[in-house]
Amino acid sequence: MKILFTDNSLWGLLNFRGSIIIHLRDLGHEVVMVSPVDAPSKGMNVPDGVRHIAINMQRTSTNPLHDVRYFFRLLSIYREERPDYIFHFTIKPNIYGTLAARLLGIHSTAMVAGLGFTFSHGGLTSKVAHQLFRFALGFADKIMVLNEENARILIERKVARKKQVVLLEGGEGVDLERFRFSDNQSDKTIFLMVARVLYDKGYKEMVEAAKIVKRTHPEVEVQLLGPVDEAYPNAVSKEQIRLDEESGAITYLGYTTEPEKFMGRPGILLLLLSNYHEGLNRSLMEGCALGKPIIASDIPGCRETVREGENGYLVPPKEVNALADAMLRYLSLSDEEKESMSINSRKLAEERFDINSVKSCYERILQECMN
């Protein structure tokens, strides 16, 4: 089969779906990726035997002319490539790609990785996007979702029909061979957040909690790893990051295509403090696989990575004091208790987040199409 993967970011395809793309290639399928080339993807390599078609799109633009151009460009690519199946990811590919596939009679699946900005914010733009989403996804064969709460909301809001929904209970999965358990024992504790640098990811709460913790534990480090995307709604500016570094609250590590090199260091505890629904957060799943304790927001897409008190703590979103309390609670644990949390994180990853179960799901969807 010829299979297309269409996303709003080459980085997203390689980072989140790279293992699936390589797996389908190895099964003998012809795989083509369609996406813009974004800044974070520079330095990342397209897998051997896989083609990439670069396409212009304005990810965050609300100008309808930009979207019309994007739709007709997708239509042209799909007509020329004539794939047997297309997987779409993120809002604009899900809307315009699904419609283009429908017009050409091509089977497709849309992945709704999370209910982020469009579903969580009010305003006319979000309402229009929601209606477009609802209309377009009616033409998808399947709609992949990453947690039960998101599935429920999509069905209740009539964005998806129950028979369309495919629940990936372990999210998009983690390669447990790449992200191996590592000894986390250390005299030093580092609280690390791995995420796009957005206020929606809990940036402000992390900074304020860091200041509270450092009053009594000045030796503790709070670090941030992830791309800065100032074009995105609710992005944190580079100037704000600089100011927070100068205050001593945090250390910004920049961005890397190999997060395990930072996450795998001894003494790491992972933070993810999203204010709104996630799909199933990738960095937290990777942290579990590496054997890192977790502190995360008690929201869908984050809470699935934490067993309270066993491998970490859940905190209410936007609650700075609750976050600081959880960080201080972890610091008060004995070495044996911290080690137990690390072991429990790895066990959870092995039980729930193995990438092999996700590969099987893609295979089943394609098999249904062939039948």
Please state what every model-predicted region is.
Residues 226, 236-256:
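Nucleotide-activated donor-binding/catalytic signature segment of Leloir-type glycosyltransferases, i.e.
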Residues 14-19, 198-212, 285, 321, ...:
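A conserved mid-protein helix/loop that constitutes part of the nucleotide-sugar donor-binding site
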Residues 308-309, 313-320, 329-335:
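Conserved acidic donor-binding segment of nucleotide-sugar-dependent glycosyltransferases
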Residues 270-271, 293-296:
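Short hydrophobic beta-strand element within catalytic cores of glycosyltransferases
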Residues 88-94, 112:
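Short His-centered aromatic/hydrophobic patch
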Residues 322, 329, 336-352, 358-364:
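A short, well-ordered alpha-helix in the C-terminal region of glycosyltransferases
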Residues 183-201, 206-211, 223:
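Conserved donor-binding/catalytic core segment of Leloir-type glycosyltransferases
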Residues 53-54, 134, 138-180:
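Donor nucleotide-sugar binding/catalytic pocket of nucleotide-sugar-dependent glycosyltransferases
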